[in-house]
């Protein structure tokens, strides 16, 4: 009789100890995993705008060509020309039309203000 009682007590103690070592998955396990994932994704809110921009550019996988990265590359051989189209003439040539509102080099005495 003593051996059977000791065996039952030993079995109960073994089950209690093993319950801590091998947890039974709860139905909330999936919910907990989703909450952890959302908290990891939510960490992006604290990032600097430059870090967010860097991550967006990395995700788009757009690359700068090697020609662009060369130091000795001159976009336009004509001095003073615009780098965009290499046309002759100044890059920022000042030319403005003459409208009534600008009051440019003409008789503006007849304009009612």
UniProtKB/Swiss-Prot annotation:
Mod. after translation: Proteolytically cleaved, probably by S1P, a subtilisin-like serine protease (subtilase).
Signal peptide feature range: 1-21
Localization: Secreted
Alphabetized GO MF terms: hormone activity
Pfam families: RALF (PF05498)
Statement: the UniProt record of this protein carries the keyword Translocase: no
UniProt record, GO biological process: calcium-mediated signaling; cell-cell signaling; regulation of growth
Annotated site residue numbers, Required for proteolytic cleavage: 54-55
Maturation propeptide residues: 22-58
An annotated GO cellular component: apoplast
This protein's UniProt keywords: Disulfide bond, Hormone, Secreted, Signal
Disulfide bond as UniProt keyword: yes
Disulfide bonds: 76-86, 98-104
Family (UniProt): Belongs to the plant rapid alkalinization factor (RALF) family.
Job of this protein: Cell signaling peptide that may regulate plant stress, growth, and development. Mediates a rapid alkalinization of extracellular space by mediating a transient increase in the cytoplasmic Ca(2+) concentration leading to a calcium-dependent signaling events through a cell surface receptor and a concomitant activation of some intracellular mitogen-activated protein kinases.
Protein name (Swiss-Prot/TrEMBL): Protein RALF-like 31
């Amino acid at each position: 009789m003593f051996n059977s009682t000791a065996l039952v007590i030993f079995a109960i103690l073994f089950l209690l100890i093993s319950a801590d070592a091998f947890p039974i998955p709860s139905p909330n396990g999936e919910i907990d995993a989703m909450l952890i994932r959302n908290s990891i994704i939510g960490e992006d809110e604290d990032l600097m705008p430059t870090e967010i921009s860097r991550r967006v550019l990395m995700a788009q996988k757009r690359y700068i060509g090697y020609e662009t990265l060369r130091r000795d590359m001159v976009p336009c051989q004509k001095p003073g020309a615009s780098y965009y189209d290499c046309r002759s003439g100044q890059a920022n040539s000042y030319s403005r039309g003459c409208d009534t509102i600008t009051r440019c080099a003409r008789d503006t005495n007849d304009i009612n203000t």
